[in-house]
């Protein structure tokens, strides 16, 4: 078999390449994007692999999220979208994945002309669908229960909700790196005039996103005197914090969580002044099925290592397309 997902979460493509986890047998490692579940074992890969491949934006994000010295522990090569690298008798090309800044799909073509594709994490709308013979794909929302059937424009709803919250004072927005910068850009583009306040790490990630073309507006560090006064006085401003900080900051304030795990409603109030907005950076079930339909693979492997519905998605793919499909690694029980 020309692709596999190992028990440690490495996505093997062809003879030489492992994506998103360490694999001692493969000389090449790819990091598809800078989220923790796709950077597993990276220190080991840097020590032992001939090359670790990623986009320039992903490298810049890892420099901020880990440290600029971290990637110096090995040989890192950045690869632009659409550029091909040859290793032995295989060719590796990155294509854009609409997920977070720098996210990539990976195509490996072997000497027999077989096209082996790993989607990485993606949203279908702005992700190019690659023709594949063997397709390895994410399965985060791989169940038919994970469909976003609402028609409303979630971005517009999010902007309206934040503007409503600003009438009461400070609005705290919680999300993950990449998603936070996406919502900053949405608010900036919509002309929301309130100051943006961020802690140091979110600030540094945001500056990388701006360097790569995102437009986020002026950001104020939360430790600055002016920002402290805004937050302490519950003045109208928007404070952006990583989801991990939700129990530490903004208690009692107007709070908005951006999350993909919402399918019934685009916006839900679950406590007084606390809302969840369904802004996802993953395809829902219909988006995953659509990728398979357009890619026309002979074999699909779903990622059964990371969080999701890999086995359910396999059943649906077999039923709808009559093609071979496997959830890997196999888990029993």
Task: List the predicted regions and their residue ranges.
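Structural motif
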Residues: 28, 51, 115-116, 134-135, ...
């Amino acid at each position: 078999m020309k692709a596999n997902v190992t028990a440690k979460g490495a996505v093997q493509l062809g003879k030489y390449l492992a994506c998103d986890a360490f694999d001692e047998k493969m000389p090449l490692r790819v990091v598809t994007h800078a989220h923790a579940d796709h950077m597993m074992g990276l220190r080991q890969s840097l020590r032992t692999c001939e090359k670790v491949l990623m986009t320039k934006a992903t490298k810049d994000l890892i420099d901020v999220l880990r440290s600029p010295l971290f990637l110096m522990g090995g040989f890192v090569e950045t690869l632009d979208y659409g550029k091909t690298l040859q290793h032995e008798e295989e060719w590796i090309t990155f294509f854009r994945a609409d997920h977070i800044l720098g996210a990539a799909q990976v195509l490996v073509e072997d000497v027999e002309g077989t096209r082996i594709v790993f989607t990485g994490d993606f949203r279908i709308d702005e992700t190019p669908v690659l023709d594949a013979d063997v397709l390895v794909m994410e399965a985060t929302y791989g169940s038919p229960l994970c469909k976003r059937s609402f028609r409303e424009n979630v971005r517009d709803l999010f902007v309206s909700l934040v503007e409503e919250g600003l009438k009461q004072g400070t609005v705290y927005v919680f999300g993950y790196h990449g998603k936070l910068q996406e919502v900053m850009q949405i608010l900036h583009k919509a002309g929301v005039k309130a100051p943006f306040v961020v802690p140091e790490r979110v600030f540094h990630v945001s500056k990388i996103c701006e360097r790569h073309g995102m437009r986020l507006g002026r950001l104020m560090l939360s430790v600055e005197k002016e920002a402290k006064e805004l937050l302490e006085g519950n003045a109208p401003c928007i404070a952006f914090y990583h989801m991990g900080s939700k129990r530490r900051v903004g208690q009692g304030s107007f709070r908005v969580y951006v999350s993909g795990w919402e399918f019934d409603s685009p916006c839900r109030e679950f406590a007084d002044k606390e809302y969840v907005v369904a802004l996802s950076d993953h395809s829902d079930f219909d988006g995953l099925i659509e990728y398979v339909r357009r890619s026309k693979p002979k074999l699909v492997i779903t990622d059964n290592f990371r969080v999701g519905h890999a086995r359910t998605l396999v059943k649906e793919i077999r039923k709808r397309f009559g093609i071979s499909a496997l959830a890997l690694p196999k888990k029993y029980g």
